[in-house]
Amino acid sequence: MPNSFGKLFTVTTWGESHGASVGVVVDGCPPNLPLSVEEIQTELDRRRPGQSDIVTPRKEEDRVEILSGLFEGKTTGTPLTMMVRNADQRPEAYAEMREKFRPSHADYTYQAKFGIRDHRGGGRSSARETIGRVAAGAIAQKILRLAGGIEIRAFVTQIQDICVPALTAFPSREEVEATPIRCPHAATAAAMIERIKAVRSQGDSVGGVIECRVRGVPAGLGEPVFDRLEADLGKAMLSLPATKGFEIGSGFAGTRLKGSEHNDPFVMRDGRVTTTTNHSGGVQGGISNGAEIVFRVAFKPTATILQPQQTVDVHGADTELAARGRHDPCVLPRAVPIVEAMTALVLVDHWMRQSAQCGTFKF
């Protein structure tokens, strides 16, 4: 099912950018989990448009409505349905895109696959689809906190050629949220913001890298072959709009090391097995080893830009397109909570699978 994710904690998203609403159905949520609308809304507010001058100015409150699966402040164990109504729609800004394909966008490939597409804001390919992921991820993050004290933190480490210095400490939520770019290094964040503003003034866009760290994951989560933990994390991240790369631990840089340099030596600390280094990124053989999980996701520059570009129309003629509408000059600030949400969805699903198979890590 191409619109669903997860095996036991299953998430199905629905809706389009300029349709009536977008939302999600969560199947497999444990019963009796205390849950409020406010907990979901807090995460949605972090991804909503219009929150700063370096993101799209589209004004959406993104107020979530829980339609089913919640009774007297607790989950019932039945499908939990959440919906957000679309409000600030301007389909006239996309009129030209009915006939012309945006370069590097999903316009052409959706047309090639389905023979029909909703050209208004990209329809189903719009990042508004991720509202459902963030709503579901808020629930998954709460389960992980209650079950094992697992903490997930994503943050921007690179915008174009501007990179943060190596960070050794696990950043706090306050450090990440201190600036609109969601980079925990203040000086680098300021340079990133200036770059985005400069590029936006030129009608252009930029990409970058988000790093995600997870602490508190016990050893044993994941599967040994096709459903390796890093494979599922990679699939989750690469399913996000605008992603073009994923690496975990040492990633591609690890290819420059020798085995004697890359191996993570085991030691006993406080009665448990741990490692002195973490080139593996917290996963070995597809299974978590108890160390901090560390991975990075590459996001391309936003495809929809205001500069004239060479393209083709639906009749097969060469033409030119200068996009209109309201678009992010850089998707990374709003992608941070989405990366955290998808991480939580992967981990809670593997947590439940491990509990079902081995009777451990119970909620």
From Swiss-Prot:
SUPFAM superfamilies: Chorismate synthase, AroC (SSF103263). The gene is aroC. GO terms for cellular component: cytosol. Its cofactor is FMNH2. FMN binds at residues 124-126, 285, 300-304, 326. Signal peptide: none annotated. Keywords: Amino-acid biosynthesis, Aromatic amino acid biosynthesis, FAD, Flavoprotein, FMN, Lyase, NADP. Belongs to the chorismate synthase family. This is Chorismate synthase. Homotetramer. CDD domains: Chorismate_synthase. NADP(+) binds at residue 47. This reaction introduces a second double bond into the aromatic ring system. GO terms for biological process: amino acid biosynthetic process; aromatic amino acid family biosynthetic process; chorismate biosynthetic process. It catalyses: 5-O-(1-carboxyvinyl)-3-phosphoshikimate = chorismate + phosphate. Transmembrane segments: none annotated. GO terms for molecular function: chorismate synthase activity; FMN binding. Reduced FMN (FMNH(2)).
